[in-house]
Amino acid sequence: MKQKWINAFMDTATRFADLSSAVRLRVGAVVVKDNRIISIGYNGTPSGWDNTCEDKVYCDDGDWREQTDKLHDEWVTYKLTTKKEVIHAEANAISKLARSNESGLDGAMFITHAPCVDCAKLIYGAGINTVYYRNSYRDTSGIDFLTKCNIEVNKV
């Protein structure tokens, strides 16, 4: 695939990431086949649910300090944690693909962030054979899984 197309599809994934209601991390994904977008996704709660993707976990541990709130006239620290019901961008794109007349077989996925191992399994199951991502993730098990499955992985 030509670099100009890679850049265009990655920019598109970034634009869809901006649609996420998440505060901590916004992720976008685009599935492409024959230089044509066949599915998109971004991280968020299921359709019809409250769009709040994170919970505030209040803590006393200074190491957890992420943000502060005034609660009952006292400043308290909290950490935002992603709700378990949040669907990852890759999973959203693949589930939309499954509900369409398109197939991911031999397609490419463009993701703003490296996939987790669970999303990597979905990518493999969808028959996608190339993954492009922009930002690394602290856990490389998703990339390791894709590489082990002989899926071409490119950081752009």
Regions found by a protein language model. Name each.
Residues 1-156:
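Zinc-dependent deaminase catalytic domain
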